[in-house]
From Swiss-Prot:
Mg(2+) 2 binds at D173. This is Ribose-phosphate pyrophosphokinase 1. The gene is prs1. One of its GO terms (biological process) is 5-phosphoribose 1-diphosphate biosynthetic process. Disulfide bonds: none annotated. Pathway: Metabolic intermediate biosynthesis; 5-phospho-alpha-D-ribose 1-diphosphate biosynthesis; 5-phospho-alpha-D-ribose 1-diphosphate from D-ribose 5-phosphate (route I): step 1/1. It comes from Streptococcus pyogenes serotype M1. ATP binds at D39, G40, E41, R98, Q99. Mg(2+) 1 binds at H132. Belongs to the ribose-phosphate pyrophosphokinase family. Class I subfamily. Keywords: ATP-binding, Cytoplasm, Kinase, Magnesium, Metal-binding, Nucleotide biosynthesis, Nucleotide-binding, Transferase.
Length: 320
């Protein structure tokens, strides 16, 4: 299919996903280059005309977070100066989403700052997947299309027979109950909740306090929006195994997997971790316990629907 007035550009963070999205749409990626000067300054060059086009930029603000964010801002500036008709940013993983409120005195709300920066740069629309906090949509005065990874994850477990009353979907904390309930609805399973307390002094650490729900003799599926150092999800998995779960699977949309994450996962009770490709994982980080499924078709369909001014609501259903 040809979209003569649409362009899709990839920046540095997830070119592999961008290529899959372009292939699903039947188009070629736009031609551009990104380079850094010796002092770290970023320069972007657009190597084809985009005058009058609706331009989509695909870039996750994963590690290195600040470089990837600056690439977007610089690219948007270049596109505006080159007379793009409309600029939409496809940010599968929205970095700084964990800083969505003041948890303590004198803290910034960096998620809002990032929203301000994108708008001031000239972004007309944002397409993202599973924000850490859904209220971040309200930080923007431009349209925000918030896709969900749960239908894709549900499709995977459905294909592997992990459905029904013998399976329990588990939220690793109270904040993820809505996400767990959605997956449980797709799979027609009960849910359970891990009651945990996060350390106020140490980042990325938490202690399992209690399991709310029956997991004994059940296959458990943990679901979270992101896994960073994997401490929380692995502690939860081990607690479920100790409580009598016959098997523990885990899933997340965003595989940040920083620091000791891979070692933690390897040593944990998790049998298989299912992740999406919102963040690029090189082959050496795809250990045997990790299986990655692609959001390319979902993102491609969303881009097409946005461009053609059609609703995105059908994309929130299992099997689409």
């Amino acid at each position: 299919m040809s979209y003569s007035d649409l362009k899709l550009f990839a920046l540095s963070s997830n070119k592999e996903l961008a290529e899959k999205v372009a292939s699903a749409m039947g188009i070629q990626l736009g031609k551009s280059t990104v380079r850094q000067f010796s002092d770290g300054e970023i320069q972007v060059n657009i190597e084809e005309s985009i005058r009058g086009h609706h331009v989509f930029i695909l870039q996750s603000t994963s590690s290195p977070v600040n470089d990837n964010l600056m690439e977007i801002l610089i690219m948007v500036d270049a596109l505006k100066r080159a007379s793009a008709e409309k600029i939409s940013v496809v940010m599968p993983y929205y970095g700084y989403a964990r800083q969505d409120r003041k948890a303590r005195s004198r803290e910034p709300i960096t998620s809002k700052l990032v929203a301000n920066m994108l708008e001031v740069a000239g972004v007309d629309r944002l397409l993202t997947v599973d924000l850490h906090a859904a209220q971040i949509q309200g930080f923007f005065d431009i349209p925000v299309d918030h896709l969900m990874g749960a239908p894709l994850i549900a499709d995977y477990f459905d294909r592997h027979g992990l459905v029904g009353e013998d399976v329990v979907v588990v939220s690793p904390d109270h904040g993820g109950v809505t996400r767990a309930r959605k997956l449980a609805q797709f799979l027609q399973t009960p849910i359970a909740i891990i009651d945990k307390r996060r350390s106020v002094d140490k980042m990325n650490t938490s202690e399992v306090m209690n399991i709310i729900g029956n997991v004994s003799g059940k296959k458990c599926i943990l679901i979270d929006d992101m896994i960073d150092t994997a401490g929380t999800i692995c502690h939860a998995a081990d607690a479920l195994a100790e409580a009598g779960a016959t098997a523990v699977y885990a899933s997340c949309t965003h595989p940040v997997l920083s620091g000791p994450a891979l070692d933690n996962i390897q040593r944990s009770a998790i049998e298989k971790l299912i992740v999406l490709d919102t963040i690029y994982l090189p082959k050496e980080r795809l250990i045997d316990k990790i299986e990655q499924i692609s959001i390319a078709d979902l993102v491609a369909e969303a881009i097409i629907r946005i461009h053609e001014k059609r609703p995105l609501s059908p994309l929130f259903e299992m099997g689409n």
